[in-house]
């Protein structure tokens, strides 16, 4: 006879726990956060904006890493256990990824805060963004099904990058349809034009957000692998000489693009300390941008209502979940990120044309067709 296991709550954020982790009952999300923070010695970099008095709960656990880590220690999570596991792994000569030590298992483990998120707290408070979060959860679960056999993230090369996003593009399309009924109701021709800009802006935003979440300078990709921007010669590795330009030339040509993306998007995202709901709000605001040229006529009437709904959701979220946060100040910080993101998207699109023109590490044909709205 099967006996139902008693589910205890996470000692840190109070969602359903996953058992004992490092000395205390915790969910997968808080266990991963504690392991990552301890192994990378990130705690000294954390700063609380509220005099170290933040209330840590499921819906706001990402808002203050300093107080979250302090609570992990308070409830009994032991850093020495993390260090002992690391030392044992080194002695066993197990493969490790020094550039991205925060991810040590499958993509699902790296992204467990999203996969384990309960949406009940958000449904009435942020109805529009709740729908986007639910769709984003589905995207992550589908990615897990696609990439689960790979247990350890690693530095990827250019060819693998193209394959990853040639497969992921279909999942992103489903994510956009599931997030916004305005998009789902469009015709096929109109959807292609809207998705073109969404694909690039979402690609850049998500890479920046995931890299911030992992606390790494590497660029984290959809499947959990990463681009080691400190060693771009490995990214542009071309052992069979299939490309018309040398890897060294590609590094010189494209490194300014990586630097621009980090400076204008990734670093501001990290400075803003985005929560998940804020990241998805940025995705929504970028998707429905009435200042974009070349979109179908049916697109523009939806932009302002969607944006107003997203901003209203954020305001409600701040007032209920973070009463000490000035909504106007926080919102202005988010909106200031948008112009730099738009410039990065334009540069990305221009670079794609250069790649194709000179056949210097061009993207997969499938990606070009998407960008061209075919």
Swiss-Prot record:
A zinc finger (NR C4-type) spans 10-30, 48-67. It comes from the Eukaryota. GO terms for biological process: innate immune response; regulation of transcription by RNA polymerase II; response to hypoxia. Residues 124-374 form the NR LBD domain. It is found in: Nucleus. Residues 7-84 bind DNA. GO terms for cellular component: nucleus. Disulfide bonds: none annotated. GO terms for molecular function: DNA-binding transcription factor activity; RNA polymerase II cis-regulatory region sequence-specific DNA binding; zinc ion binding. Pfam families: Hormone_recep, zf-C4. Keywords: DNA-binding, Metal-binding, Nucleus, Receptor, Transcription, Transcription regulation, Zinc, Zinc-finger. Orphan nuclear receptor. Belongs to the nuclear hormone receptor family. This is Nuclear hormone receptor family member nhr-57. It comes from Caenorhabditis elegans. The gene is nhr-57.
């Amino acid at each position: 006879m099967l006996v139902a296991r008693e589910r205890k709550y996470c000692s840190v954020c109070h969602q359903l726990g996953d058992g004992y982790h490092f000395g205390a009952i915790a969910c997968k999300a808080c266990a991963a956060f504690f392991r990552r923070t301890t192994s990378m010695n990130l705690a000294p970099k954390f700063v609380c904006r509220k005099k170290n008095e933040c209330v840590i709960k499921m819906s706001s656990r990402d808002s203050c890493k300093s107080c979250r880590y302090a609570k992990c220690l308070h409830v009994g999570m032991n850093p020495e256990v993390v260090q002992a596991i690391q030392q044992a792994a080194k002695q066993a000569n197990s493969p490790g990824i020094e550039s991205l030590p925060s991810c040590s298992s499958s993509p699902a483990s790296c992204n467990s805060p999203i996969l384990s998120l309960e949406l009940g707290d958000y449904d009435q408070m942020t109805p529009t963004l709740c729908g986007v979060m639910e769709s984003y959860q589905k995207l992550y679960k589908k990615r897990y099904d696609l990439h689960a056999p790979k247990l350890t993230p690693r530095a990827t090369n250019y060819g693998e990058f193209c394959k990853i996003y040639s497969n992921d593009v279909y999942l992103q399309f489903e994510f956009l349809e599931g997030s916004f009924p305005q998009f789902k109701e469009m015709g096929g021709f109109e959807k292609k034009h809207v998705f073109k800009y969404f694909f690039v802006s979402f690609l850049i935003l998500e890479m920046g957000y995931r890299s911030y979440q992992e606390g790494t300078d590497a660029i984290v990709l959809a499947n959990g692998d990463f681009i080691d921007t400190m060693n771009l010669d490995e990214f542009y590795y071309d052992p069979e000489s299939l490309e018309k330009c040398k890897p060294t030339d590609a590094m010189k040509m494209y490194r300014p693009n990586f630097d621009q993306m980090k400076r204008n998007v990734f670093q501001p995202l990290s400075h803003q300390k985005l929560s998940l709901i804020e990241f998805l709000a940025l995705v929504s605001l970028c998707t429905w941008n009435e200042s974009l040229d070349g979109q179908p006529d049916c697109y523009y009437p939806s932009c302002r209502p969607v944006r107003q709904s997203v901003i209203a959701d954020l305001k409600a979220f701040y007032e209920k979940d973070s009463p000490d946060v000035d909504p106007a100040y926080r919102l202005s910080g988010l909106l200031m990120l948008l112009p730099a993101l738009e410039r990065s998207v334009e540069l990305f699109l221009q670079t794609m044309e250069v790649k194709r023109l000179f056949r210097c590490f061009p993207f997969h044909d499938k990606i070009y067709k998407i960008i061209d709205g075919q």
